[in-house]
Amino acid sequence: MKRISLILLLFSCNFLVSQRIALVGGTLIDGYGNAPIYDSVILINDETIIDIGTVGNIVVPEEYEVVSTEGMSVMPGLWDMHVHLMINGHSDYAYWDKTYPKLFKDVIMPSSAHQLLMAGVTSARDLGGPLEESLEVRDMINSGKIPGPTMYMSGPFVQKKPYPGTELFRWGVNGEKDARNKIRILAKAGVDLIKLIDQDQMTFEELSAIVDEAHKHNLKVVAHAHRPCLLYTSPSPRDPHLS
């Protein structure tokens, strides 16, 4: 049996509040390359898939709420490994960064999370955003207060120097001691991983301290290697993202 990870494309997941659900009539794509199952039936009990078949071979128990998926595709929820909930439909970073931070937590980040869910994404990594807002939005999703995928949040970018006006979501490091302290703060706050950017501007000692301190707190480190010079040899083989 599997924990439920299905999402109906173009269909709200709000119906899953019921304990016993039967999804009936859709085309099931299992994500493993097998042939689609037409006229599928999926029985869900307390968020656990207990049976999968077709209209012809599964009888839906009377106590199940039937949700028609006829004409729809049903598939496993998707993962998006690199998102920024604070960025939504814009191209002018300078304008965005000074205009909209006050709307991040209550408007923009929840809206971005909802859009991901409606696109079929049920889990995502947010790799750079304001610390408090990121964790609050993650926790609101987890508690069912707002719709969205399961979010894994890095909080602020960690870099040598934040760009002017971006200090809310970009944290600079100045020396090995400061690098370790920044990671301790993030770990204590409850981030799920650490995000590096512009690490070619750091000393190797600063970079090594970040990775080492992150590992002490069982946090993975993801590096944004968008320039050839950023393809460092990792200070630790545990983070292939830095290779």
Residue ranges and their predicted role:
Residues 162-212:
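Active-site gating/metal-coordination segments in enzymes
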Residues 109-132, 149-156, 188-199, 220, ...:
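Divalent metal-dependent hydrolysis catalytic cores, especially in the metallo-beta-lactamase
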Residues 73-140, 164, 205, 226, ...:
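Metal-associated gating/positioning segment near the N- to mid-region
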Residues 232-243:
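Single conserved hydrophobic/aromatic residue that forms the stacking wall/gate
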Residues 26, 42, 47, 71, ...:
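Divalent metal-coordination and catalytic microenvironments
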Residues 1-19:
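Bacterial Sec-dependent N-terminal signal peptides
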Residues 28, 32-75:
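Histidine-rich, glycine-flanked metal-binding segment
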Residues 147-149, 207-223:
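Alpha-helix-loop-beta-strand connector modules within alpha/beta enzyme cores
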